[in-house]
């Protein structure tokens, strides 16, 4: 994501040491280089995109952000600790000469734990963090110290840049205010206790930023609360204080480079570093409304040129691109994705903000993996260094020595974690468990300790608590995996480790992994050696690490034996398609934005829709900040909009630039641009020029094989743009080819087909207008029916392989041209499916030619239809509203799972092979095929457990532990015959989901609930194999049965059955908008008949 940080993270370690030695200045004066570090030594990703990986080669769903947050907390040291650097050894040598005499391991652990407790004094309350004042002035504390992180990898430690941690906050159990001196910590310690430094401006006054939207440009103050990973901002006002007799005439308070302030209100003006300091401008809050989101809500971030599509859409000058930040996040109150476009005042502020976000993300991932490290893994030198770096300051703010007299300083040093500390850790890590359960574990550890050697700690000021060894016991009990233990017991049969042959049997016979080309067992041996323990075999932890790794991904991939998968003609594929791609909300009053194109392309969409209209000649171009082009007219400039509705237009040129930029990042296969032309001939000329200028040689403007009468394959059109546009030439000179298709002769006549259009029906097939216009919402601005503009030849001729023609009849010669494409509304195709004769013709047509189906214009809220009936009849492009994550879109994304197909799915052979001619025209070939060739598929699914499930979506229950249960649904089958088991079916929620069963409710445990519920039976299906599995995680207000309370869906996963591998698998879940929940997963066992895979493998 943050590609621009790569070079900043490459600063050498010597420079890092110099920065750390000169770290006494204020955070606001820090050098930008001090704000960046890379915990792994590798450059960060190009996008902070919290979705599943789109690349098959890079897909590692659980390896990077593991729900098993305690995987690194071990009781025994299993690896040799890294050795300190020469400089560290020198520091240790000098410090050890003045250290105390106690060097035993037990006292060492206690003292380290004491230091950690003093460090961990951050609050979870953002208001509390701002209320802390210093002793001498009453102003917010701005003095914060630097923790120098020694970055470690798997092989050797590396020195990293200093990172800024938030100011010291009040501890919930003490009135004492602790000050920290500069220390050195290994990053595992700092991160495991949740510490990170950020510039103090984010926790004190807030960073001034310029917020850009379609409606306005406003100044805001931006805060970050690192204790709970929260971002917040408020609108700001400016006040000016004169500090000298000479007052600067400069009034611009905009980011550097902005000279045109006509688009900004007076409240948006503050000073910048470039302005003379004779007048001091300060920001104040204009209202009490606070906008906020947390780190986990962020879906993607675009910085600088990555966000050029948004910047151009908002008419912001390119000179401000270097300070541009776009944050896409989920707004819980509005239950939708929101875009936050920001411009920093200068380069330094930009680096501060980006660094803070990146470091918080790294910390969040680290906390989710580790929670707290095992100090036994620290080498002795690091232990001594920690002991001799005193964390506790005296009353005068100076360090008195290695040991501080608590009675003199009136500071109370704790060597334990209270139960309140445990709750704070749980809240920070989103451990969604009943408080009573945590209390029981807490008391259990205390009881075990009192029965052995140690007694519970108790002081007059603090309640009883756990020392470090006891806390490790607490974590061990909390993370205990009974489900994994049962699997291990069944495999090991009493053994402590498993050897190679046993692991090979597990991988091949239980996990059903296909290693047919691994004759020498080299692949399996590589996996075995990677997770071997010290006993030269696999233990229980080895097994879990393998199940969580990329070697155990739950989804199948195209194997090397399927190298010809993309070599078939385009008409033999299902193609991932979007309807009204430019919309981010409803059809009537939603926003139009390039964001719609960016998001769909990032998810693998291969056919996007662009509705092109004339720009309004009565208005001028929106003022571009930083330019002087205020008087340029927008007449005849093509715009993208949803007709004459309340949606906002966007520039066609900006749309094409954004499409080109993101077109082939996720998928290399051809992208179809479906153009809907509603503009004048003059504007169409500009459309042609824009397409050619921006797309260049990547756009298909001539057949790649002029003699071919079949469509080319995706492999032949790799990285190419295909234009789909209406054909203007009449079909009067068609030549029939040998295979029955028709092609046009070289001589063409130019005529134009005119159609009518209304605001409710703006797509290709206008036959829906009659039925749609009568049901138009009163919210739409009505206009006279005008004839659609004529499509000029220059534009029509760009439709090389996807010529849009109006459907009249399947038997006409124009319906047999190899490169035509029918576009039908859902009402039209539904009528065809109900007619037996038309259904046969529909199936026959779609075996050889292209068709696109789109939702009705009466779906004012951009809802979706069920795409399964249209796929079952071979429709290649079933366009859905991607901005609405309902069942239709869930099925659409499940079919085109990016990790596997990247937007192109080869249709089942039964939908590609030519149909046999029947002696009777009344025979329904599909009905006959379904009756004689149905399949019975045995299945056995076991939902074993869940991990870090989301919290209640309602504010009324947000602080309560959830009562989760999971529904299991089979979609697309003719029938399902369930085996008898303890789970009872519940009534279907929709007509497309007739077969649902549920697990039992687990009381107040969303952290690691064990469901242990099996679902087995037989699926009766046709040979098209369009069978899908849907998991929905619910949070219930009832403790026993769903019918007794409210049930809130909190996570969803829909996948095609034969995409799933068998065996034990971790499956990541999506939120209600289809975005992956990075830390939430379910652990399941999958079994079904191998016969179902034959169609998938042997296509």
Swiss-Prot record:
The keyword NAD does not apply. The active site is at residues 579, 642. Substrate binds at residues 724, 726, 823, 852. Residues 1-10 have a biased composition (Basic and acidic residues). Residues 566-726 form the PI-PLC X-box domain. Its EC number is 3.1.4.11. GO terms for biological process: lipid catabolic process; phosphatidylinositol-mediated signaling; release of sequestered calcium ion into cytosol. Keywords: Hydrolase, Lipid degradation, Lipid metabolism, Transducer. Residues 43-66, 86-109, 142-155, 743-778 have a biased composition (Low complexity). InterPro entries: C2_dom (IPR000008), C2_domain_sf (IPR035892), EF-hand-dom_pair (IPR011992), PI-PLC_fam (IPR001192), PLC-like_Pdiesterase_TIM-brl (IPR017946), Plc1_PH (IPR037755), PLipase_C_PInositol-sp_X_dom (IPR000909), PLipase_C_Pinositol-sp_Y (IPR001711). Gene3D superfamilies: C2 domain, Phosphatidylinositol (PI) phosphodiesterase. It comes from the Eukaryota. PANTHER family: 1-PHOSPHATIDYLINOSITOL 4,5-BISPHOSPHATE PHOSPHODIESTERASE BETA-4, PHOSPHOINOSITIDE-SPECIFIC PHOSPHOLIPASE C FAMILY PROTEIN. The production of the second messenger molecules diacylglycerol (DAG) and inositol 1,4,5-trisphosphate (IP3) is mediated by activated phosphatidylinositol-specific phospholipase C enzymes. This is 1-phosphatidylinositol 4,5-bisphosphate phosphodiesterase 1.
């Amino acid at each position: 994501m943050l590609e621009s940080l790569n070079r900043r993270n490459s600063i050498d370690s010597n420079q890092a040491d110099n920065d750390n030695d000169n770290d006494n200045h204020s955070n606001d004066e820090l050098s930008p280089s001090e704000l960046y570090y890379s915990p792994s030594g590798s450059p960060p990703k190009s996008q902070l995109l919290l979705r599943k990986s789109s690349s098959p080669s890079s897909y590692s769903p659980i390896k990077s952000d593991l729900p098993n947050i305690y995987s690194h907390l071990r009781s025994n040291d299993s690896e040799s600790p890294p050795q300190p650097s020469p400089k560290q050894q020198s520091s240790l040598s000098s410090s050890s000469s003045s250290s105390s005499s106690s060097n035993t391991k037990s006292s060492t652990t206690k003292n380290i734990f004491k230091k950690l407790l003093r460090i961990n004094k951050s609050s979870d309350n953002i208001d509390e963090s701002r209320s802390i004042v210093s002793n001498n002035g009453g102003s917010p504390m701005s003095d914060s110290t630097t923790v120098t992180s020694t970055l470690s990898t798997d092989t050797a430690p590396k020195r990293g840049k200093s990172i800024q941690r938030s100011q010291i906050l009040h501890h919930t159990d003490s009135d004492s205010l602790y000050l920290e001196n500069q220390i050195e910590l290994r990053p595992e310690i700092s991160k495991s206790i949740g510490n990170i430094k950020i510039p103090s401006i984010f926790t004190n006054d807030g960073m001034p930023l310029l917020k850009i939207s379609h409606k306005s440009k406003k100044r805001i103050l931006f805060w970050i609360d690192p204790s709970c990973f929260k971002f917040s901002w408020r609108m700001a006002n400016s006040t000016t204080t004169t500090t000298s007799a000479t007052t600067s005439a400069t009034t611009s308070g905009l980011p550097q480079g902005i000279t045109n302030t006509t688009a900004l209100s007076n409240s948006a003006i503050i000073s910048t570093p470039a302005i003379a300091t004779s007048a001091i401008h300060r920001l104040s809050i204009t209202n009490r409304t606070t906008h906020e989101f947390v780190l986990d809500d962020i879906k993607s971030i675009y910085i600088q040129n990555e966000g050029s599509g948004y910047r151009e859409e908002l008419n912001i000058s390119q000179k401000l691109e270097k300070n541009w930040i776009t944050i896409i996040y989920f707004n819980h109150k509005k239950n939708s994705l929101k875009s936050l476009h920001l411009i920093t005042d200068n380069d330094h502020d930009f680096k501060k903000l980006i660094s803070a976000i990146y470091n918080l993300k790294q910390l969040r991932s680290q906390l989710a993996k580790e929670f707290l490290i095992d100090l036994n893994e620290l080498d002795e030198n690091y232990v001594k260094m920690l002991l001799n770096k005193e964390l506790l300051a005296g009353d005068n703010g100076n360090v008195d020595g290695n040991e501080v007299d608590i009675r003199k300083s009136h500071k109370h040093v704790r060597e334990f974690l209270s139960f309140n500390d445990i709750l704070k850790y749980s809240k920070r890590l989103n451990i969604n468990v009943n408080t009573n359960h945590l209390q029981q574990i807490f008391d259990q550890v205390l009881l075990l300790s009192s029965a052995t050697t140690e007694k519970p700690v108790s002081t007059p000021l603090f309640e009883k608590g756990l020392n470090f060894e006891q806390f490790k016991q607490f974590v061990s009990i909390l993370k205990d995996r009974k489900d994994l233990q049962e699997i291990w017991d069944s495999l090991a049969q009493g053994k402590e480790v498993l050897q190679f042959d046993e692991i090979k049997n597990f991988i091949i016979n239980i996990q059903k992994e296909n290693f047919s080309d691994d004759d020498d067992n080299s692949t399996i041996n590589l996996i075995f050696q990677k997770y071997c323990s010290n006993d030269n075999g696999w233990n229980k932890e080895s097994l879990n690490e393998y199940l969580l790794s990329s070697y155990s991904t739950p989804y199948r991939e195209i194997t090397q034996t399927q190298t010809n998968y993309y070599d078939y003609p385009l008409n033999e594929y299902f193609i991932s398609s979007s309807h009204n791609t430019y919309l981010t909300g409803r059809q009537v009053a939603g926003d139009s934005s390039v964001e719609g194109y960016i998001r769909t392309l990032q998810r693998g969409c291969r056919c996007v829709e662009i509705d092109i209209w004339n720009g309004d000649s009565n208005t001028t171009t929106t003022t571009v900040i930083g330019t002087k082009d205020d008087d340029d007219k927008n007449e005849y400039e093509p715009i993208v909009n949803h007709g004459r509705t309340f949606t906002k237009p966007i520039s066609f040129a900006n749309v094409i630039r954004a499409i080109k930029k993101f077109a082939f990042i996720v998928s290399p296969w051809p992208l179809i641009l479906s153009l809907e032309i509603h503009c004048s001939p003059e504007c169409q000329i500009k459309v042609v020029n824009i397409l050619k200028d921006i797309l260049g040689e990547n756009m298909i403007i001539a057949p790649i094989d002029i003699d071919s009468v079949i469509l080319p394959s995706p492999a032949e059109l790799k990285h190419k743009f295909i234009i789909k546009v209406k054909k203007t030439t009449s079909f009067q000179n068609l030549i029939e080819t040998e295979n029955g298709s028709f092609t046009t002769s070289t001589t063409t006549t130019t005529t134009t087909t005119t159609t009518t259009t209304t605001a409710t029906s703006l797509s290709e097939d206008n036959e829906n207008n009659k039925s749609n216009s009568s049901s138009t919402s009163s919210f739409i601005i009505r206009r006279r029916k005008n004839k659609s503009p004529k499509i000029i030849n220059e534009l029509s001729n760009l439709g090389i392989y996807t010529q849009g023609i109006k459907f009249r009849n399947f038997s006409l010669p124009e319906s047999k041209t190899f490169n035509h494409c029918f576009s039908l509304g859902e009402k039209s195709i539904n009528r065809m499916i109900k007619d037996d004769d038309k259904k046969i013709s529909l199936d026959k047509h779609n075996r050889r030619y292209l068709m696109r189906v789109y939702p009705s214009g009466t779906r004012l809220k951009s809802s979706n239809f069920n795409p399964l009936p249209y796929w079952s009849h071979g429709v290649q492009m079933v366009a859905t509203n991607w901005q609405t994550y309902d069942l239709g879109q869930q099925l659409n994304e499940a079919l085109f799972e990016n990790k596997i197909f990247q937007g192109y799915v080869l249709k089942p052979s039964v939908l590609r092979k030519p149909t046999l001619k029947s002696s009777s025209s009344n025979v329904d070939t599909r009905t006959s095929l379904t009756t004689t060739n149905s399949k019975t598929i045995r299945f056995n699914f076991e939902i074993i457990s869940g991990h870090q499930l989301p919290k209640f979506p309602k504010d009324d229950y947000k602080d309560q532990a959830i009562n989760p249960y999971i529904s299991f649904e089979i979609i697309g089958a003719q029938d399902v015959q369930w085996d008898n088991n303890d789970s009872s079916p519940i009534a279907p929620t929709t007509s497309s989901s007739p077969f649902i069963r549920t697990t039992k409710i687990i009381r107040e445990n969303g952290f690691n609930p064990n469901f242990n519920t099996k679902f087995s039976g037989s699926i009766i299906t046709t040979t098209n194999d369009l069978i899908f599995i849907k998991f929905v995680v619910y949070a219930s207000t009832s403790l026993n049965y769903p019918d007794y309370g409210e049930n809130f869906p909190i996570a969803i996963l829909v996948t095609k059955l034969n995409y799933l591998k068998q065996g034990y698998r971790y499956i990541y879940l999506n939120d209600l908008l289809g975005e992956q929940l990075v830390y939430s997963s379910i652990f399941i066992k999958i079994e079904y008949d191998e016969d179902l895979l034959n169609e998938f493998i042997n296509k």
